[in-house]
Amino acid sequence: MAPSFENLSEQDLHEEEEEEIDFSDLKAQYEVKLEEGLDTFVVIDGLPVVPEENRQKLIKFLLRKLNTVGHTSEDAVFMPLNEKNMSEGFAFVEYETAEQAVAAVKQLHGTPLDKKHTLLVNKLMDIERYGREGRIDEEYKPPNIEPFTEKEHLRSWLGDPNARDQFALYRGDKVGVFWNNKSNPPENVVDRAHWTQLFVQWSPKGTYLASVHPQGVQLWGGPTFSKQKQFPHPFVSLIEFSPGESYLTTWSARPIQVEEGHPVLTYEEDGKNIIVWDIVTGKPLRSFVSHDLAGPESEAQPKKKVQWPAFKWSADEKYVARMLQGQSISIYELPRMNLLGKTSVKIDGVMDFEWSPATVNRDGVKQYEQLLCFWTPEIGSNPARVALMSVPSKEIVRTRNLFNVSDVKLHWQSQGNFVCVKVDRHSKSKKSMATNLEIFRVREKGVPVEVVDSLKDTVINFSWEPNGARFVLITTGDASGAGAPPKTAVSFFAPEKKGVQAGNFKLVRTIEKKTSNAIYWSPKGRFVVVATVHSQSNFDLDFWDMDFEGEKNDNEKDLAANLQLMKTVDHYGVTDIEWDPTGRYVVSGASAWTHQMENGFNLHTFSGETLAENPTDKFKQFLWRPRPPTLLSKEEQKQVRKNLREYSKEFEEEDKYAVDIANTAVVEKRKRVLNEWVAWLKREKELLTEEKEAYGLPEEADQPKAAKDAPTNTEDKGETVVEEIVEEIVEESEEIIG
């Protein structure tokens, strides 16, 4: 029976304390989080120290900066005073939302207020989080400065004396980087097991090789491919570089869960799917929730396919934009990642958009601009619409209305001269489909639109010539029988010859009764491979020349093209085709990611000659290393083309010399092996002679008859074992290749 209160002893009173009951689970469950309600506050340090009568004036001046990243007011700024009625050099500011407070920290921290003062902006809760007891040492300890180590040259491969190109090869669990040696075996640069868990990807200028892991993305570079930068993003699945390699976008289907004390990620990234990184600093600029994963799913509205790239970059990296399908396009300014004009561009029904891949100077337009093209479907009685928008003004500079639209695809020419709008139209009964092309001539005054409506079937693939004004498309009519690949037609288009500007686009030739479904232009233009990929029955690669130097057909004389099929080759199970950055070589690959039959890659010349076949077990990925843009001016490039025949003679001599060196290497190897054999034979004979002397055998003891008749030495005590060695030289030859 428990004692009554009156009978409790001193020991009984403290008995419960001694048991030390653990309440940590209850504390964790009911603890009041200080972040709640305070995540909209920031602390601004580095302000001028002013008397009370100047405080309001300083606050108004400060608000000019504060309102560039969000919304706040004079009442939401608290600037404390000391006993002398002087400000303390800091202030507390409340924003309307936590997102605005985060933007203030990222965009205003370290910015100058005037010539003498620099703003230092921190979240109020960061001061509590990092400044609480035990987090900061009472005594100052100087930081440990590591000794200077010179970094590797990140573009060293461009200095190869033979101007060779590199490629990355992913097979099995190994990734290697190799030099291309034409028909000779590739030369290994580095080869590592478990270098990546998902895939590898070159940056657009070839500076970095990215490997993807469950922990994040790792960039490698330099002659030895050492570690350059790390971007922690748990369970990252997709990555995208900006055109100039300044920024990196990473995406994961799983929202990020940030652990306390993480060296890079903060609670601002918690729960996000997308991070935009600064490659130079290795720090996140801003993080976002994926539109496709936001909100609850229902049976009526199934989960949409992930839009990738989620962010699309302008040609000069000054802007990056993302689309909320059907509603708006949000354009952000770099490097601050603030929303342009503080608002998204509201576009009802917007389905897709694309930036111009180059900065365009339109006729009659002097101010700086980047161009963006988007389209909207038919909504009610309103027609579908394609529009060109100028950024940063957000002005619509050209629109085009479309009717009976099923789908639209936007295709920019690499220099931004044209944008082709591929419009799939249905008949009024919606039983048949056809395609026409609306080509915007962007650089011409008023942006005129040319319509190509001579196509009777649906276009399934379209591709502009790089740095040119020609294009290739593939059409298909009615579907073929079960199991049979659809019959397609390949059409080549070129402009008419009309002065400096490209004339109207005309059909050069159509190749019927094909199964082709993919188009791969040389990065230098002129040559194009039209292929059948991901097929179970057809594997043809057609190598075409658009500027054949032979005789021209009469009906093509007025067009800026002379079409010629150079060669057709087959590659069983082909899934991917990759041009090298110089346009000299083409690699066709059969990836194990698609099928397990005869995986490997073949190397071809631009004209279709197969230089090497490389069957490779568990082959997954082949990627040529990109090259940065040339540093030569247009005039210097023109001079190089003019003297190309002279250079080609030098190249032919170098190729011949390389072949001679290869033959010489073979001869030297054979001589070395022969000399090693002769030396070994001499050494063995010397050992044999020593053994004969040790056992008192005659010189002819190695002959069968002499060994049998040899006298026995009875002076030795015990038994003597004589080993008979029989050596026969079957054949000995010496071959020397000149």
Curated annotation (Swiss-Prot):
Q: Where in the cell is it found?
A: Cytoplasm
Its GO CC terms? Answer: cytoplasmic stress granule; eukaryotic 43S preinitiation complex; eukaryotic 48S preinitiation complex; eukaryotic translation initiation factor 3 complex; eukaryotic translation initiation factor 3 complex, eIF3e; eukaryotic translation initiation factor 3 complex, eIF3m; multi-eIF complex
Q: Which Gene3D superfamilies does the record associate with it?
A: 3.30.70.330, YVTN repeat-like/Quinoprotein amine dehydrogenase
- Extract the ranges annotated as region (Disordered): 1-20, 693-720
Per its UniProt record, what PROSITE patterns does this chain match?
Answer: RRM
**WD repeat placement:** 193-230, 232-289, 301-342, 454-494, 511-554, 569-607
Q: Name one Pfam family in it.
A: RRM_1
The residue ranges crossing the membrane are: none
- Coiled coil residues, start to end: none
| HAMAP family per the UniProt record, alphabetical | eIF3b
Protein name as it appears in the record:
Eukaryotic translation initiation factor 3 subunit B
Q: Which organism is it from?
A: Emericella nidulans (strain FGSC A4 / ATCC 38163 / CBS 112.46 / NRRL 194 / M139) (Aspergillus nidulans)
Query: What gene codes for this chain?
Result: prt1
